Amino acid sequence: DREVWRTGFPRHDHLHSLLGRERDSILLAPTWDPEVSRALECDPDAVGLLSALYRPWLELAAGLTQAGHRTVLFAHPKLVLHAPEWFRALGVPAVTGHDLPETLVRSWAVVSDRSSVLDEGMIAGCVGIVWDPRGRPDTDRYRARHEAIGAIGADTSAQVHQAVGDVVAGRVTAPEDLLLLDAGACARLTALLRRDMI
């Protein structure tokens, strides 16, 4: 809904203040899996589930790094909470929620299966690339919605590599009509709340 984009979210005010940084990385943002999170909560040794969940993303990160791109992995805070050592040992730089805004404004593109991090990236000037290595049916709806506002859909990791190359070379750019215009989301939301108060 364009009205939501125009109003903004309070956290976007901070994101806006960071815009204009030099872009030097590709952010991979797989969505979290609540079943994996619950399993880790019950059994901290169930890190094999994390390995299975992140394997295609780590393979993509390795390929992009080999192609000369600085790659950063978004690690969902709920998963990091249960297995911090696993994420520290990845060999790929990983960020959680706290460092995410700085990473977004420095990223050329955000690659995601369906994480809201892709939305945040697109309003921060990143090109959105939708790729689901598990090919879940509901990702098609997510992909279609995001392609309608300028994201790139990718069916294979090779297509992700091609899209990243196009973005870094400047052949594909982020849609300008999605960029944050100001840091006034808090003020707008407060005004709307005051208007509707009884």
Feature locations, PLM:
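Hydrophobic/aromatic beta-strand patches that form the interior of the parallel beta-sheet core
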Residues: 5, 27, 72, 93, ...
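Donor nucleotide-activated moiety binding/catalytic core segment of transferases
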Residues: 77-119, 123
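Short, surface-exposed amphipathic charged segments that create phosphate/polyanion-binding patches used
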Residues: 17-28, 108-114, 166-170
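Short, acidic/turn-prone active-site loops that include or flank metal/cofactor-
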Residues: 9-11, 97-101, 133-137
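C-terminal alpha-helical cap of glycosyltransferases
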Residues: 181-198
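Catalytic binding pocket for nucleotide-activated donors in carbohydrate/polymer assembly enzymes
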Residues: 85-88, 116-181
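A short, active-site helix/loop in glycosyltransferases that binds the activated sugar's phosphate group
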Residues: 1-2
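Conserved catalytic-core segment of nucleotide-activated headgroup transferases in glycan assembly
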Residues: 7-86, 154, 187
